[in-house]
Amino acid sequence: MLRLIAPTLTLLLVAPLGAQAASKQEFELSTMLEKVAKESSVGTPRAINEDILDQGYTVNGKELINHLSVREGQAQQMRANPDAVRSQLGNSVCHNNGYRQLMTKGAVLKYQFTEYKTNRPVISQTFQASDCAVKKPGK
């Protein structure tokens, strides 16, 4: 009987420590994302180019969301070519050291595009650490 009680007691005492560690990591990630969103939103809205307006960042759980508005013509192109949009965004995200560091800590980056003035949804894309993993050639 004692053989069963000791391991069970140990598990009961250790389990909350693991939960606290996870909660601490989640709290630290959330705090970091809030800081990044606040700093990255300074000066918004701002034009990225003649077709894209950066409206700023928000945080939802582990997601850092970049809100972007695009002109109607750009919106049509993006809707017609979602794979090209994902490829271009992915290339940008995966080559950004700061974004990669956030993703290795569990963050998910989301780009949310809407049409300028109407706010009609255009496209949303999310990226996590596994999206930037180096693909090894097959043997």
Region locations from a protein language model:
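A short amphipathic beta-strand at an alpha->beta junction
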Residues: 93-123
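Short N-terminal segments immediately surrounding and downstream of signal-peptide cleavage
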Residues: 23-41
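A mature extracytoplasmic/lumenal domain signature
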Residues: 68-72, 113-117, 127
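Short, non-transmembrane amphipathic alpha-helical segments
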Residues: 76-102
